[in-house]
């Protein structure tokens, strides 16, 4: 803030003559700067010592002195920004840049992408919105989920290649023959980000805190109790076998923060700043796995960089650009893929909506070309043909005598593409004689709302990170959507079916059983996927090791910058 005030005062001195020499009294300068004569003399002395201007005072009160400017406010601002970066004051950079929002792109351009600051490799990512606080348990946004995975660790984690759980805070685990006891053996060299040694009691306490959350209690519903059975061992005792347990513990929602300090973890990066304008991560010197190659990663929250009229493809969160938005022609795509996650439609059968009427709605969506012609941005989405690869969408020949209800109600939440989808579906069903009432829930999930209670149709977004089959099991088990899709007996039957699936020790059998559950949901016209996203990551030359993750981000621990040439 001090830099910002000094720049403001310098601009007030400069503006009346646009930088030309001035003959002026100290009193006039004090009035211009909204301060006392004594203070303006201090400002002039400090600015002259810094080499910004020359001030030749005349003896005597009220005498006019000579003021000559040596630098422009623009060059001074840039110098201040560089100085702030070199001293680790990124917040000052953003405050200085906001002085001229029309020039924000030009001002920030030199500081984006990969930079070496004081021999420290730093990656700066411009981002289109403030990040939401990192709360324990489930998080709604992809960026927040990814960030949690960089800051916190779980007892287990998902292998990048196989998508199966492997050791993390626990180096190994053992399961009893009946599947009711799981022993997790902790690494002996674990440290929290604040330098404290990790104790089994810390992790035990945080796990018990997580189980107080309703969604996590539902996720771990088979857990009877958790005990510290040895200073290096945590043991889970179960009511019934749950061969998803290692998967559940590897999911970001089960990652473990310090029991007293919820933003201190054990992950590869520690959180050093979290504001609405800037989020900064620095590598954890005592990380227990492979150390990051970057020292720091920064999210610069700069929404003006992402206005539509700028023509930047990184406006949308599924298209991440690392680097300089003003020079997109120099930024090349380094990784891309189709998301496993999807936007979906669920249908609540009732006296208002029969099975064949629901099937007709789904058939209209998938067979009319509606999804292929949504106006949501070029190459942003692709129509879904399967829930997961190999889990194909059924097709029906709907009898001609099946007519849609006169009225239906649709409730949906973000992302923004579902605005367009809802409007197109409304128009399409109107042509079939069905009036569709649309209700928008302005959130990224179904938490904290009862709007679904009155809905025949519901649309939302199902993010899928690692282990897609397990993620869908977790979705059915924990999402508050499903009690509104089914009546009470059907929902209880669904949960019992999931319980029967989880007791299967063989992974392939579990996957096949879960596939059968979702195939039945699609056959019953309870669920259909709508479209998937094209994930893209672009980076300028010199940012290496960028690998697309299943959430559409990139693994911070693998990115690296070559040393600057001498």
What residues fall within each predicted segment?
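N-terminal lobe/hinge region of extracytoplasmic solute-binding protein
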Residues: 126-175
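A bilobed periplasmic-binding-protein/Venus flytrap-type ligand-binding module shared by bacterial periplasmic
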Residues: 282-285, 336-360, 373
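Extracytoplasmic/peripheral linker and loop segments enriched in polar/acidic and small residues
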Residues: 475-540
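Long beta-strand-rich cores associated with HINT superfamily self-processing modules
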Residues: 539-566
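Surface-exposed binding/hinge segments that line
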Residues: 66, 216-260, 266-273
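Ligand-site clamp/hinge motif
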Residues: 286-329
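Aromatic- and charge-enriched surface segment that lines or borders ligand/interaction sites
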Residues: 19-22, 41-43, 140, 172-215
């Amino acid at each position: 803030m001090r830099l910002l005030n000094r720049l403001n005062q310098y601009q007030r001195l400069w503006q009346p003559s646009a930088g030309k020499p001035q003959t002026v009294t100290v009193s006039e300068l004090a009035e211009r700067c909204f301060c006392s004569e004594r203070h303006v003399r201090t400002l002039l002395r400090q600015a002259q010592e810094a080499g910004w201007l020359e001030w030749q005072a005349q003896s005597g009160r009220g005498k006019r002195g000579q003021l000559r400017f040596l630098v422009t406010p623009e060059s001074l601002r840039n110098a201040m920004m560089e100085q702030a970066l070199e001293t680790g004051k990124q917040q000052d950079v953003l405050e200085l840049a906001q002085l001229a929002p029309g020039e924000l792109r030009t001002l920030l351009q030199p500081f984006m992408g990969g930079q070496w600051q004081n021999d420290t490799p730093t990656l700066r990512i411009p981002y289109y919105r403030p990040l939401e606080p990192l709360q324990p348990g489930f998080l709604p946004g992809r960026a927040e989920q990814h960030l949690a995975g960089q800051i916190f660790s779980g007892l287990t984690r998902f292998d990048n290649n196989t998508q199966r759980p492997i050791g993390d805070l626990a180096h190994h685990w053992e399961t009893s023959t009946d599947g009711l006891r799981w022993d997790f053996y902790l690494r002996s060299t674990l440290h929290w980000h604040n330098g404290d040694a990790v104790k089994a009691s810390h992790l035990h306490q945080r796990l018990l805190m997580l189980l107080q959350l309703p969604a996590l209690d539902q996720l771990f519903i088979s857990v009877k109790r958790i005990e510290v059975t040895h200073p290096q061992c945590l043991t889970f005792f179960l009511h019934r076998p749950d061969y998803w347990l290692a998967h559940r513990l590897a999911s970001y929602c089960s990652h473990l923060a310090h029991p007293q300090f919820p933003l201190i973890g054990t992950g590869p990066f520690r959180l050093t700043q979290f504001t609405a304008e800037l989020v900064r991560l620095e590598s954890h010197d005592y990380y227990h796995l492979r150390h990051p190659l970057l020292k720091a990663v920064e999210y610069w929250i700069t929404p003006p960089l992402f206005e539509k009229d700028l023509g930047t493809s990184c406006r949308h969160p599924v298209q991440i650009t690392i680097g300089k938005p003003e020079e997109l022609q120099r930024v090349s795509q380094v990784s891309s893929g189709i998301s496993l996650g999807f936007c979906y439609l669920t249908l609540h059968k009732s006296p208002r909506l029969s099975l064949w009427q629901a099937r007709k709605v789904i058939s209209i969506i998938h067979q009319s070309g509606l999804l292929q012609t949504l106006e949501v941005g070029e190459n942003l989405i692709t129509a879904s043909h399967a829930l997961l690869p190999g889990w194909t969408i059924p097709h029906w020949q709907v009898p001609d005598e099946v007519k849609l209800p006169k009225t239906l109600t649709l409730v949906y939440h973000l992302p923004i593409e579902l605005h367009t989808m809802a409007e197109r579906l409304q128009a399409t069903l109107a042509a079939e004689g069905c009036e569709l009432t649309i209700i928008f829930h302005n959130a990224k999930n179904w938490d904290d709302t009862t709007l679904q209670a009155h809905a025949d149709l519901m649309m939302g977004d199902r993010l899928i990170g690692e282990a897609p089959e397990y993620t869908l099991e977790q979705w059915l088990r924990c999402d508050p959507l499903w009690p509104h899709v089914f009546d009470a007996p059907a929902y209880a039957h669904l949960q019992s079916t999931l319980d029967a699936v989880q007791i299967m020790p063989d992974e392939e059998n579990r996957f096949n059983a879960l596939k059968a559950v979702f195939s039945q949901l699609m056959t019953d016209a309870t669920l259909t996927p709508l479209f998937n996203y094209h994930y893209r990551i672009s980076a300028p030359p010199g940012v290496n090791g960028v690998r697309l993750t299943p959430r559409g981000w990139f693994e911070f621990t693998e990115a690296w910058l070559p040393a600057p040439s001498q």
